[in-house]
Amino acid sequence: MGFDNPRSERFEDDPEISKIPTTSGVKVKYHIDGTQIPEQSSKKSRKNETRNKFLKTRVLSRVFSEDYERVKKRVLVLDPRGQLIHRWNKIFLVACLVSLFVDPLFFYLPVVREEVCIDIGKTLEVILTVVRSFGDLFYIVQICMKFRTAYVAPSSKVFGRGELVLTYSKIALRYFSKGFWLDFIAALPLPQVLIWIIIPTLRGSTMANTKNVLRFFIIFQYIPRLYLIFPLSSQIVKATGVVTETAWAGAAYNLMLYMLASHILGACWYLLSIERQEACWKSVCNMEKSNCQYGFFNCHSIKDAPRVAWFIASNVTNLCSPNAGFYPFGIYADAMTSKVTSSPFFNKYFYCLWWGLRNLSSLGQGLLTSTFIGEIMVAIVVATLGLVLFALLIGNMQTYLQSITVRLEEWRVKRTDTEQWMHHRQLPPELRESIRKYNQYKWVATRGVEEEDLLKGLPLDLRREIKRHLCLELVRGVPLFDQMDERMLDAICERLKPALCTEGTYLVREGDPVNEMLFIIRGHLDSYTTNGGRDGFFNSCRIGPGDFCGEELLTWALDPRPSVILPSSTRTVKAFSEVEAFALIAEDLKFVASQFRRLHSKQLRHKFRFYSHQWRTWAACFIQAAWRRHKKRKEAAELRAKENLVAASEAENEIAKKYGKGFVVYGTRVARSTRKGVNMHSGTNSGVVSSLQKPTEPDFSDE
C-alpha cells in the first residue's frame, strides 16, 4: 500500500504497482550491476503517470480514531467519539423527550360540544402543529448527522484500536441497513398531514372515525420515537459514563419518565372517554333508527334541518348521562360526571394527568370496569404498566438518592460498630469520648471521602498537579524549603498525606521516636519541653498555620549515613484546637533528602537553626546561662573589690600603729599580691548554670 501519512491515512492501492520503483512518475529498471535502464516506451510512461496521479487523488477511506483531528477538515465526516456528537446526542435526547410529551396532546383535539357532537379544537390544533413541526426538524437533523458520522470498522477492533471508516458511500450503506427506516418513520409529519389534509376531506359519518385514525397514526409513530430513546441513552452512557452529572438530576430524569407515562395514559383515557360517549350516542341512535344518523354527531352538520329536528325530539342527553344507568361507562364515568370532554384544554389536561398518575401509582385498584373486553384490557394494561413503572421508579430513585447518602450511612454503620467495640472492650468514658470526637471531626472535614484512595486512581501527572495545587504554597511557607527548586518541592508535595487531630490529642511526647513532620494547614498546636524532666525547666511555644513540627527528622534525614533508629522527640506536641495538616513520614523525607543533593547545602544551615524550635530552645538557654554567668562574675568582682578595700585599710592601720609608715607600704604590697594569687585560683570555680545540651549539627556536606 502507498501511504501519504503512515499513521493517519490509508489508500487502497494496487500492491504490485506500489512495489515498482518510480522516478518522476516513470518506472525505473536496473542492470544486474545496478546501473539504471531508462524506460523506452513513452506510451507506458504516460500510462504510469496517469495511474500514479489516480492513486494520489484517491479518496481517503479509513483513519485511526486518534488521528482523526489531522484529516477532519478534508473529509467533512464527524467522529462518533468526538465532543460534537456527544453534545448533539444530549440535545437530541431532550428533543426526543419533548416530542414524546407533545405527541399525546393530539389526543386532546376532539372536543364534545353541548349539541351532542364531536369537533376539533382549532387553537390547540395550530399550536401543536407548530411545536410538532419544530420538533421534527431535530429528527431530520439527526438523519443528516448520521449520514456524515463515521463508524468504526468491525474488522479493525481485533487489533485493539478501531479504524474510522470515512467513505460516504459505506457510511450511507451501513446507515440504510441499520436504523435509517426507523429514523425516517420517526421524522415523518404524520399528525400534521392527518389533521390538516386527511381529516378536513372527510365528510358525514366518517368524521366519527377520526378518533380511530388519529389514535392509530399517533401510536404508529410514537412507538419508534419511544424506542429511539433507549439506544440514544446507551450512547450517552457509553461516552460519558452517566446520562446525568448529578444524583438529583438522575432522580428527576426517572421521575420525569414516570410522569411522561402518566401523561400518555391520561391522554389515552381522554380519547377513549370520547369514544365511549360516542358509543352511547350511537346506541341511542340505533333505538331511534328512523330519525337518527351517525352523521349527526359531526359538528359540521348541527345546522342541518334533519339534525335539528332529531336533536329536539331525541332524549340522547338524558339517556347518555352517567347517572341514568342506560349505558355502562365503566372506567370512563368520571369523564362524563366531571364533564372533562367538554372542558377547556388546561382543565381537562391536568385532570387527565392526575387520573393517569393516580391509577399508575395505585396499580389500577380504583378502576371499576364494565363487561366490555376493550375496557378490561385497558385496566389490565394500566395495572401491569403501573406495577412495572412504579418498581422501576422506586428502584432508580433509590439508586440515585442512595448515591448521595451512601457515605453518611456508611459512617453511621461504622460509628455503630465503633460503639459496640468500645463497649465490648470496656474502654473508659474519657477514651470513648475522644474516639467519638475524632470520628465526628473526620466526618465533618472529609465527608467520608478518602482522599488518598481518590488520588491513587488518577494518573501520576494529575496526582502531581493536584498535590502541587494543595500543598505547594504550604511547603513554600516553610522558610527551610522556600529556596528549593521546583522539582524538589514537587517531590515533597507528592509525598504529603492529610492528617487530622482533635483538641487535646498528643501528636508526639518528649522522648518518643519522631515518625513524621507535620505542616499545619489550620488549627494550633502547643509545643513544650522540660529538658528531659529537669526540675525548674519549662519552655513552650504555639505552632499555627504555616508552621511545622518534627524537625528532628530533618537532621536524621540529612545525615548521609542515617541510623536505622528514628530520632527521639525533644518536645511534646499537643493539639490546642482541631488541627488539619499534611504529614511527611520519615521514609519519604529520607527519600527526598537522598534524591536531591541540593538539600545538603550549607546555605540552609542558618535557616534550619533559626526556624527550628529545638535550636531556638537551645539558643535561649545558652544565652540565659551566659547572662547568668556574666551577672554572677560581676557581682563576685564587686564583692571582692569591697572586701579588698576594707582589708587594706584595716591592715594599714595596724601596721602604722606597730611599725610605722614604711612597713605600711610594704605590707600593703604583699597583701595585694597574695589576694591576687588567691583570686586567680578561685575565680573559675564560681557557680555556673549548666546549659541545655546542644542539638545535633546536621551534616550539609555532599557525599
Swiss-Prot record:
Tissue note: Expressed in roots, stems, leaves, flowers and pods.
Bilayer-crossing regions: 91-111, 179-199, 216-236, 255-275, 372-392
Membrane topology per record: Multi-pass membrane protein
Residues annotated to bind a nucleoside 3',5'-cyclic phosphate: 480-565
Protein name: Protein CNGC15c
Disulfide bonds: none
Source taxonomy: Eukaryota, Viridiplantae, Streptophyta, Embryophyta, Tracheophyta
Polar residues compositional bias, start-end: 681-694
Function text: Cyclic nucleotide-gated channel involved in the establishment of both rhizobial and mycorrhizal associations. Required for full activation of nuclear-localized Ca(2+) oscillations by Nod and Myc factors. Simultaneous activation of the K(+)-permeable channel DMI1 and the Ca(2+) channel CNGC15 can give rise to sustained Ca(2+) oscillations. May function during fertilization in both female and male gametophytic Ca(2+) signaling.
Chain's gene name: CNGC15C
